[in-house]
Structures are given as C-alpha cells and as structure tokens.
Regions:
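Formylglycine-dependent sulfatase
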Residues: 1-249
Length: 249
C-alpha cells in the first residue's frame, strides 16, 4: 500500500487506534456521530429489508456540523446505517447532512467487479463497469471537479466496500499475490486496488492545489474477518477482543 504508507509517513500514524464497534453498522454510526452506537438507533448489523432500525434523524452527524459551518458535504461508497427499503421508510443521507451522495445501502452486487446496485442521491444508477473502489473514487473526483463553488471548503466521507466479501479484483493485481482463484491473493489485491484508487484521489487534490489544505483520515470500521490479516491480534471481526476492535489509523 504505497499510497497509504506515504500518507502515514508524512502525517500521523496511530498504533493503538480502535473502532467504535467490532461490526459494521454500529461502528459507522459511532464514527459519524461520536456517540455510543445504542444511542444512535443502531444496535447490530443492519439489513434494510428486514430491520426498521436506522441512524436516527435526531442524531447530529459530522456532516451536519460541517455543513452548518459552510462546508459542502458528500458521501461516497457503502452506507449501511439505514436506507429506505420497500415500506420500511428511513431518513435519507440528505437528512443526515450530505448535500450529495453516491453509493450503496450495503455491499456491492454481485461483487466488487461491475456492480449493479449503486445509487446517486437515491436513484439507481444501473450496471457499472469496473471495480467498486475505483468507481467510488471516479465519482468523488467528478464531484470535486463539478461542485457548484470550487472555493467552498468540503467534507468527503468515502467508505470503500473492499476488502469486504464478496471479493473481486483485477487479475493483473491478483497475480502479484498468488493464484487467481486464491481467496487470500484476491483479498490482498482488493487492498492494493483500493490503495491505487486512493492514489488517484490524492493526485487530484494535488493537481487542484487542495492537498496541502486537506486533512485526510484513513481507518477501518473494525478488524478483518480474516484471522490471518489481523496482525497476530486475538479475535477478528465481530469479536470484542483486539482483533475485532483495533484498526489502522
């Protein structure tokens, strides 16, 4: 991950960084609000078609705070803290302070390659070509280039799907790490591909002269579901041991 390594080398690296919870939805609710997840209305992993729970509209997110301070706000990628599904009506991302959003209620389908379930401001986009992380960054770059006031300060909340299953990555990257059908190699390739996507975004910020005045924060919502990718820590995703809660920062 040369891009992330470069950002860490020029910034601050936290070696004892912890997520808000050991599973996805609660951790994301905590990250956006700074509050214990049960207070936000999120008490477990969310499935919109099955659950009424969602990030409560009364909760104040970082996007709402920054929007009130004059920032342009946007979300890109996985959401997973509540979207309307059928008769289960839930607040929109606009209700939570985002002027614009492009992403998914949960995972990419059928996998990270050529996903079919992305939405833009609540409307389905349809089948897309490419890989989720690159698709998300392309839309983020387009938003930066076309937002109404280029001089307005901005907050971008980018939540990548990779390296969550179901896995998919370009063969030319997977082959660097092993056999094309090896799940561990594909997992590594999704991390590599995400690093390359982040590199494109950093390059755009540099090209537009915004990089030196932009704070970039990179982390994860919990530990890996692969026990062999948790740095020897006890436990993994879903566990309240360090392997479930420690994350990069």
């Amino acid at each position: 991950t040369p891009v992330l390594d470069g950002l860490a080398a020029k910034g601050v690296r936290f070696t004892d960084f912890h997520a808000g919870a050991a599973v996805c939805s609660p951790s994301r609710a905590t990250l956006l609000t700074g509050r214990q997840n049960l207070r936000t209305g999120i008490y477990g992993v969310l499935q919109d078609h099955m659950h009424d729970m969602h990030l409560l509209e009364r909760e104040v997110t970082i996007a709402e705070v920054l929007k009130k301070a004059g920032y342009s706000t946007a979300h890109f990628g996985k959401w997973h803290i509540g979207m309307t599904s059928g008769k289960r009506k839930k607040p929109s991302l606009q209700d939570h302070g985002f002027d614009y959003w492009f992403g998914l209620s949960n995972g990419a389908h059928p996998n990270h390659r050529n996903p079919t379930n992305f939405m833009r401001n609540g409307k389905r986009v349809g089948p897309m070509k490419g890989y989720s992380c690159q698709i998300v960054v392309s839309d983020a770059i387009n938003w930066l280039e076309t937002k109404a006031n280029p001089d307005q300060p901005f907050f971008m909340n980018i939540w990548f799907n990779e390296p969550h299953s179901k896995l998919a990555a370009p063969d030319e990257i997977t082959s660097i790490y092993g056999d094309l059908k090896d799940e561990a190699a594909i997992y590594s390739a999704t991390v590599d591909n995400t690093d390359r996507a982040i590199g494109r975004l950093v390059a755009k910020l540099k090209e537009t002269g915004k990089l030196d005045n932009t704070l970039i924060i990179y982390s994860s919502d919990h530990g890996s579901y692969r026990a062999d990718r948790n740095g020897g820590l006890k436990g993994n995703k879903g566990s309240n041991f360090q392997g479930g809660l420690r994350s990069p920062g």
